[in-house]
C-alpha cells in the first residue's frame, strides 16, 4: 500500500481564520477525489529555521495569514521550494510572498517589499484600490495555463480575504524569465502566477480552498496534490 502523501502547510494557524477552517476540508476532498491517503502537517513559521519537515514533505502550501510571524523564514523556505522544484501552492498571503521572493531572488530587485510590513523600497505588493476582505469576484485564466487546466475552464468565481495585491506599476516587469501571470480580475489586475520551469508552482491571491466550505472541490488543491503524486 502506498505511503501517505506528506503535505506541509506553512503558516501560523488561527482557528478563527476562514481559510484555515477550509483547508482541512479541501485537503480531505482532494484526497478522496484522488483516492489517496494524506498526512498534512501544519508548520508554524517560527519553526522555519529548520527546513527538515519541508524537505521531507511531498508538497508545500504557503497558506493565508500574513504578515507571518517569521517573514525571513518564509522567504528562505520559498527560495528552497522554488529552486528545489517541490510542488508548491500559495494562496492569499502565500501569493504575495511568492511574488516578493521572485522579485528579490530571480529579478534581482533586492529592495522589493510588501507595503503591509515596510515603507521602504519597491512596493511590489501594495494596498488594493478596493478591499477584498470577505469579497468574491470573477477571475479569468490564461488558456493553457496550469490554473486553467486545473479548473478545465477559463474563469471562476472566487473568494478573497485581503487588502494587498500586486502593484500594477510592477506587474508587466514581473513577467519574463519563467514567471507567467495567468489569472486576472475583470479589471485586469493580477490574481495568479505560475512558474513555467517548475513541476508545479502556482500562487493565487484568491483562496480556492474556500470552495470546500460549499461542499465543492478545489481544483487547484487537487492539481497540487496530483503534481506531488507524479513526482513522488
Residue spans for each PLM region:
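N-terminal beta1-alpha1 cap of cysteine-dependent amidohydrolase-like domains
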Residues: 1-95, 100-155, 163-177, 181-197, ...
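An anion-binding catalytic pocket shared by soluble metabolic enzymes
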Residues: 160
Amino acid at each position: 500500500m502506498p505511503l501517505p502523501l506528506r503535505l506541509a502547510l506553512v503558516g501560523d494557524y488561527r482557528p478563527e481564520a476562514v481559510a484555515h477552517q477550509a483547508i482541512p476540508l479541501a485537503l480531505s476532498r482532494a484526497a478522496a477525489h484522488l483516492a489517496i491517503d494524506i498526512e498534512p502537517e501544519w508548520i508554524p513559521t517560527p519553526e522555519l529555521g529548520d527546513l527538515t519537515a519541508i524537505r521531507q514533505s511531498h508538497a508545500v502550501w504557503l497558506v493565508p495569514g500574513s504578515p507571518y510571524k517569521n517573514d525571513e523564514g518564509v522567504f528562505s523556505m520559498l527560495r528552497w521550494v522554488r529552486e528545489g522544484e517541490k510542488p508548491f501552492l500559495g494562496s492569499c498571503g502565500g501569493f504575495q510572498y511568492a511574488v516578493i521572493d521572485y522579485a528579490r531572488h530571480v529579478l534581482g530587485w533586492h529592495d522589493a517589499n510588501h507595503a503591509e510590513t515596510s515603507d521602504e523600497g519597491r512596493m511590489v505588493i501594495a494596498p488594493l484600490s478596493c478591499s477584498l476582505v470577505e469579497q468574491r469576484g470573477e477571475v479569468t485564466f490564461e488558456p493553457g495555463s496550469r490554473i486553467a487546466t486545473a479548473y478545465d475552464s477559463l474563469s471562476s468565481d472566487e473568494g478573497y480575504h485581503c487588502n494587498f495585491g500586486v502593484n500594477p506599476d510592477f506587474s508587466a516587469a514581473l513577467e519574463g524569465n519563467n514567471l507567467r501571470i495567468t489569472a486576472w480580475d475583470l479589471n485586469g489586475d493580477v490574481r495568479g502566477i505560475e512558474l513555467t520551469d517548475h513541476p508545479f508552482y502556482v500562487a493565487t491571491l484568491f483562496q480556492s480552498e474556500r470552495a470546500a466550505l460549499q461542499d465543492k472541490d478545489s481544483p487547484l488543491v487537487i492539481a497540487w496534490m496530483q503534481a506531488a503524486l507524479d513526482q513522488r
